[in-house]
């Protein structure tokens, strides 16, 4: 049965593509590409002559029916401008339409700027939130950041070079001076990964160029208070002044946030 293949392609270096992906592109009846120029560059590099059609944000409605019709006759390979289709691009809508028609959907995994940036960021990767491209307008951007400000997981976002400084200013305002890894031109000749704080990044990227993936530290858990020598001394002083053990513990709990159990054990 004809199948829709969701094919990951390189995010920069053309060598970052699997043999399975190349075979799928070669054998498909049609390739639906978000950016035909970039995809043709990849196909030419590997001598692939499969017919290609454009499928991007501004023609997705008019092209959807055509691509579904082609799927009645043979396999279609969906590719994005770079990386894995369906992430911040119209590929998602084609997948939904294929699913509604019970067309088999198979992923051909591979490059992803999100995972690549996380892997080299030096920030926690056990839990993360991807928020796509940051909104263009400052007000919307701040509201978007505020909605995830309390999340403890790492945050990943895309940003254009001409808006990077504005985005960093809003990051600092809404999230504070958190640790960040700002990845530029990943896998390309001039790849660069900046690791530091938001304020340091503001100073570093005076004239930003290229494509940026931002990896932002999640909200840090407040450090739990500990039973220190001073606290033990405070307990003894309270008891010496006539307070019962229960009263002394209650007062210290109120002042320090320590648990009663910890204080009774001390």
Residue ranges and their predicted role:
Residues 25-31, 102-106, 154-155:
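Short active-site oxyanion
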Residues 129-150, 216:
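A short, charged helix-loop
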Residues 72-135:
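Short glycine-cluster motifs
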Residues 3-4, 73-77, 153-154:
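Loop/turn-to-beta-strand initiation segments
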Residues 154, 158-266:
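A contiguous loop/helix-start segment that scaffolds small-molecule binding in enzyme catalytic cores
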Residues 33, 80, 107-110, 157, ...:
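General beta-strand structural signal in soluble alpha/beta enzymes
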Residues 53-61, 134-138:
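Conserved helicase motor
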Residues 1-58:
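Glycine-rich, flexible N-terminal cofactor/catalytic loop recognition
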């Amino acid at each position: 049965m004809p199948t829709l293949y969701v094919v990951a392609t390189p995010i920069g270096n053309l060598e970052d593509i699997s043999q399975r992906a190349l075979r799928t592109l070669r054998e498909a009846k049609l390739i639906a590409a978000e950016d035909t120029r970039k995809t043709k560059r990849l196909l030419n590099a590997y001598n692939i002559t499969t017919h290609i059609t454009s499928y991007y944000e501004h023609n997705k409605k008019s092209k959807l029916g055509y691509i579904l019709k082609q799927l009645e006759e043979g396999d279609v390979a969906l590719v994005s401008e770079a990386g894995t289709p369906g992430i911040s691009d119209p590929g998602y809508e084609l997948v939904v339409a294929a699913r509604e028609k019970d067309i088999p959907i198979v992923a051909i995994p591979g490059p992803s700027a999100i995972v690549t940036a996380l892997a080299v960021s030096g920030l926690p990767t056990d839990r993360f939130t991807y928020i796509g491209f940051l909104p263009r307008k400052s007000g919307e951007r701040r509201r978007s950041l505020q909605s995830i400000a309390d999340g403890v997981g790492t945050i990943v976002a895309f940003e254009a070079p001409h808006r990077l400084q504005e985005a960093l200013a809003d990051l600092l305002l809404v999230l504070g001076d958190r640790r960040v890894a700002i990845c530029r031109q990943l896998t390309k000749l001039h790849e660069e990964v900046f690791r530091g704080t938001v304020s340091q990044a503001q100073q570093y990227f005076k004239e930003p160029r290229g494509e940026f993936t931002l990896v932002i530290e999640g909200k840090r858990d407040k450090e739990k208070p500990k039973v220190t020598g001073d606290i033990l001394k405070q307990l003894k002083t309270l008891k010496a002044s006539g307070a019962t053990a229960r009263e002394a513990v209650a007062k210290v709990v109120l002042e320090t946030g320590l648990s009663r159990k910890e204080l009774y054990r001390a």
